[in-house]
């Protein structure tokens, strides 16, 4: 039975991938990314669980596979149903301020790079990781705003400079400091969109190149530990001396399993089983707890106040034990720990949000910026946790609550169609 469920999961994601690939601009769909990550990142971990029954009892795979299959399918159905009604008004950024935001936020990528580089070198900066990544987020917003703005405007020297200023630090972090798969993916995704809007007649070539890049990235990601170890180490031959194909084979057979660190989907399987046996669910409050962790500053309110705002659950300690600050629990655990077998509603709701933003993004720079800001993180929503996407929504809400005077309600006229 387990083998049949694994087969269903594989076929489901192949179908989703094929359907999105054939759709116009389908590579910029969250379903395309989720299906790709499911096959390229989750499937090797799933087969590892299957081939290591001495670590992961086969019985825990039923709830895990049910959750994986239903969540992905719910996400597909939620994205498939488009909003067809024309909105009367949409929230948008006043056009005269778009360039201001692009120029203002572009240097934030550089600040992020300097903070992280200093930390990597062991230099004390006084800024923690959460603060550093908020600077990175602002740099991403500058990059995304530039691309969305270029839908209807020409590329100018100022925009070119902002694109370079916001992009280079991201690539430096990806290839020079940490070996970040997400940063590499985001740059590839956003620049694929840039080339698409500027050269729409070349979209067939762009989607093929992007798909090949994504495939190579998934293969390389299965060797991420060696990549990060060998990066910049000339004595080991660098990343070119890694046997990627052999590592890929080991990833599917359980041969690359780290007995000390564990793995993300394995944590999800054990965490789901724990919630099931303890009959304890958080009813979606993981989103609130994540908000408190990310955006309630302990330096202002104190650690005790911050801890008091978090809604505690018994499973939290078990998850901390499993992850040990090294690995994650995946978005599938977030779904099941919220509503048990009905956890797929979380994925469906997220897909509907994407569909809603996309429908309004046709008429609004603000909504399209939000769409791509979330889309750029949907890959890690599957592999790491859904909070990483919800946090982007929270960040934009907080940011534009402060910058509310830049927004206005734009009436949709026939000329906008």
PLM features per residue range, with description:
Residues 1-86, 161-171, 187-221, 393-403:
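N-terminal "leader" segments that precede or initiate the main folded domain
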Residues 2-18, 45-50, 81-85, 155-159, ...:
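Hydrophobic alpha-helical transmembrane segments
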Residues 8-20, 140-153, 345-359:
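Hydrophobic, aromatic-rich transmembrane alpha-helices
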Residues 22-37, 91-100, 154-164, 358-371, ...:
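Membrane-interfacial loop-to-transmembrane alpha-helix junctions, especially the N-terminal start
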Residues 47-55, 114-134, 320-332:
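Juxtamembrane membrane-water interface segments that cap and precede transmembrane helices
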Residues 75-203, 212-232, 314, 415-416:
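Membrane-embedded catalytic interface detector for glycan/lipid assembly enzymes
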Residues 143, 176, 324-417:
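Hydrophobic alpha-helical segments
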Residues 218-347:
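Small-residue-enriched transmembrane helix-hairpin modules in multi-pass membrane proteins
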């Amino acid at each position: 039975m387990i083998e049949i469920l694994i087969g269903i999961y594989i076929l489901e994601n192949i179908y989703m991938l094929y359907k999105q690939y054939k759709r116009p601009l389908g590579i910029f769909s969250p379903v395309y990314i989720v299906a790709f990550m499911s096959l390229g990142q989750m499937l090797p971990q799933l087969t590892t669980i299957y081939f290591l029954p001495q670590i992961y009892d086969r019985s825990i795979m039923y709830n895990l596979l049910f959750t994986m299959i239903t969540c992905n399918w719910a996400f597909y159905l939620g994205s498939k149903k488009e909003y067809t009604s024309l909105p009367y008004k949409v929230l948008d950024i006043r056009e005269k301020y778009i360039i201001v935001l692009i120029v203002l936020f572009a240097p934030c990528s550089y600040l992020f790079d300097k903070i992280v580089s200093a930390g990597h070198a062991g230099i004390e900066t006084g800024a923690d990781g959460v603060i550093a990544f908020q600077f990175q987020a602002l740099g991403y917003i500058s990059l995304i705003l530039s691309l969305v703005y270029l839908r209807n405007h020409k590329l100018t020297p100022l925009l070119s400079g902002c694109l370079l200023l916001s992009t280079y630090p991201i690539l430096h972090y990806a290839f020079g400091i940490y070996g970040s798969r997400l940063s590499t993916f985001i740059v590839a995704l956003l620049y694929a969109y840039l080339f698409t809007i500027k050269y729409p007649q070349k979209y067939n070539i762009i989607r093929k190149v992007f798909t090949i890049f994504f495939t190579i990235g998934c293969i390389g990601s299965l060797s991420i530990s060696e990549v990060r170890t060998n990066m910049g180490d000339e004595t080991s031959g660098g990343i070119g001396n890694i046997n990627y194909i052999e590592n890929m084979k080991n990833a599917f057979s359980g041969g690359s399993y780290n007995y000390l660190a564990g793995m993300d989907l394995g944590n999800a399987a054990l965490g789901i089983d724990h919630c099931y046996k303890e009959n304890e669910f958080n009813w979606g409050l993981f989103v609130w707890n994540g908000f408190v962790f990310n955006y309630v500053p302990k330096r202002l309110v104190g650690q005790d106040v911050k801890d008091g705002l978090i809604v505690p659950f018994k499973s939290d300690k078990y998850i901390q034990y499993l992850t040990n600050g090294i690995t994650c629990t995946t978005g599938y655990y977030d779904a099941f720990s919220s509503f048990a077998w009905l956890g797929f509603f979380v994925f469906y709701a997220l897909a509907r949000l994407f569909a809603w933003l996309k429908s309004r993004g046709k008429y609004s720079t603000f909504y399209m910026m939000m769409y791509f800001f979330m889309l750029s993180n949907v890959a890690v929503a599957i592999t790491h946790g859904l909070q990483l996407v919800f946090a982007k929504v929270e960040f934009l809400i907080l940011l534009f609550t402060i910058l509310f005077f830049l927004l206005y309600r734009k009436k949709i006229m026939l000329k906008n169609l």
